[in-house]
C-alpha cells in the first residue's frame, strides 16, 4: 500500500467574510507529482502555504508522515518552496545562492561544495558556480531557484506557479525538465498552476479546485476523459456539453436522438449531462452524419482548425486538421467511447 506523506484533514481557512478553504481534505502520496489546478481565488496557493507553514488553518489538521505539524514553523518542516518570483540574491553568485541554506545550517564546506556541484548537475547548470545570477536567462534563474530548494534535501518540494514568468517555449521545456528532476530524485512535488497544459503534461495526480473545494482528483487521463462535472469539463480543455436523458445502460438521448455510449449505472430516464470533446467529433457528409449542422465560423489554431457548427440552434465546436467553408452543411459522427456522461448538478 502506498503511504501518504502529507494529509490535510478538514482544513478550513477564512479571510474575514471570505471562505478560502471549506472542510478541505487531501492525501498526497510519497514520490508523486501532484498538481493543484484551478482558477485564481480557488484556494490552491493557500493550500500550498498551509502545507509550508506560511499560513495557518483556522480548523483542521496538517499531517506529515502521520504526525501533526499545525504549529511547526516553516524552517522545521521537511519541505522547501519555489515561487514564481525566484527571490535569488542579486549580490551573490550562483554558488552562494544555492549554498545559502546549507551555510545557515553551518554545514561543513566540503559537504556544501559536493552538494552544490551535485544539484547544479541535476538542473543541467554544471560549471555555473561563479556566474552572477543577473547574467542568467529567466529559465536558468528558475533552475537556480529549484537547485537552492533541492540542495536542502527536502522530502517535499512545493512549487507555486514557478513557470508563470517564462515564455511559452521555455515554459514547455521546463515542464519536461521538472518532471525529469522529480523522477530522478523520487521525492514528492506539489505544484500549483492555473495552466491546464502544465498540469496535464507533468502530473501523476491532478486536483481540480474551485471555491475552496476539490471538484475532481485523478490522473491526467481521468480528469480529461471523464470529467465529473461541468466545471471540470469546461476548465480542462474545450468541451461540447448538452443536457440529456440516460435511457438505460449504454444508451443515451441528447440533441433529439438516441446514441450508444459506454456508461452504465444510472437510473432509467435519469437527467444527465453529456460531454463530447471537439477533437472526438468526426466530420462527414451531411447525409452520412448522426447529426448535421451549418458551419458558422472557422479559426486556424496552428495544429488544427476550430470549426463552429449550428445544429438546430445548438452550438458545436469541432477540431479538425481539414477546414470547412462557412455556410456549408456538415455531418457529425460520434463514437460511443467518445460520449462521456456526467450526473446532473444540483443548482
Curated annotation (Swiss-Prot):
<dbReference type="Pfam" id="PF00005">
    <property type="entry name" value="ABC_tran"/>
</dbReference>
<dbReference type="Pfam" id="PF08402">
    <property type="entry name" value="TOBE_2"/>
</dbReference>
<dbReference type="InterPro" id="IPR005893">
    <property type="entry name" value="PotA-like"/>
</dbReference>
<dbReference type="GO" id="GO:0043190">
    <property type="term" value="C:ATP-binding cassette (ABC) transporter complex"/>
</dbReference>
<dbReference type="InterPro" id="IPR008995">
    <property type="entry name" value="Mo/tungstate-bd_C_term_dom"/>
</dbReference>
<dbReference type="GO" id="GO:0015594">
    <property type="term" value="F:ABC-type putrescine transporter activity"/>
</dbReference>
<comment type="function">
    <text>Part of the ABC transporter complex PotABCD involved in spermidine/putrescine import. Responsible for energy coupling to the transport system.</text>
</comment>
<dbReference type="InterPro" id="IPR017879">
    <property type="entry name" value="PotA_ATP-bd"/>
</dbReference>
<keyword id="KW-1003">Cell membrane</keyword>
<dbReference type="InterPro" id="IPR003439">
    <property type="entry name" value="ABC_transporter-like_ATP-bd"/>
</dbReference>
<protein>
    <recommendedName>
        <fullName>Spermidine/putrescine import ATP-binding protein PotA</fullName>
        <ecNumber>7.6.2.11</ecNumber>
    </recommendedName>
</protein>
<keyword id="KW-0472">Membrane</keyword>
<keyword id="KW-0813">Transport</keyword>
<comment type="similarity">
    <text>Belongs to the ABC transporter superfamily. Spermidine/putrescine importer (TC 3.A.1.11.1) family.</text>
</comment>
<keyword id="KW-0067">ATP-binding</keyword>
<feature type="binding site">
    <location>
        <begin position="38"/>
        <end position="45"/>
    </location>
    <ligand>
        <name>ATP</name>
    </ligand>
</feature>
<dbReference type="InterPro" id="IPR013611">
    <property type="entry name" value="Transp-assoc_OB_typ2"/>
</dbReference>
<keyword id="KW-0547">Nucleotide-binding</keyword>
<dbReference type="GO" id="GO:0016887">
    <property type="term" value="F:ATP hydrolysis activity"/>
</dbReference>
<dbReference type="InterPro" id="IPR050093">
    <property type="entry name" value="ABC_SmlMolc_Importer"/>
</dbReference>
<dbReference type="GO" id="GO:0005524">
    <property type="term" value="F:ATP binding"/>
</dbReference>
<dbReference type="InterPro" id="IPR027417">
    <property type="entry name" value="P-loop_NTPase"/>
</dbReference>
<feature type="domain" description="ABC transporter">
    <location>
        <begin position="6"/>
        <end position="236"/>
    </location>
</feature>
<dbReference type="InterPro" id="IPR017871">
    <property type="entry name" value="ABC_transporter-like_CS"/>
</dbReference>
<keyword id="KW-1278">Translocase</keyword>
<dbReference type="InterPro" id="IPR003593">
    <property type="entry name" value="AAA+_ATPase"/>
</dbReference>
<comment type="subunit">
    <text>The complex is composed of two ATP-binding proteins (PotA), two transmembrane proteins (PotB and PotC) and a solute-binding protein (PotD).</text>
</comment>
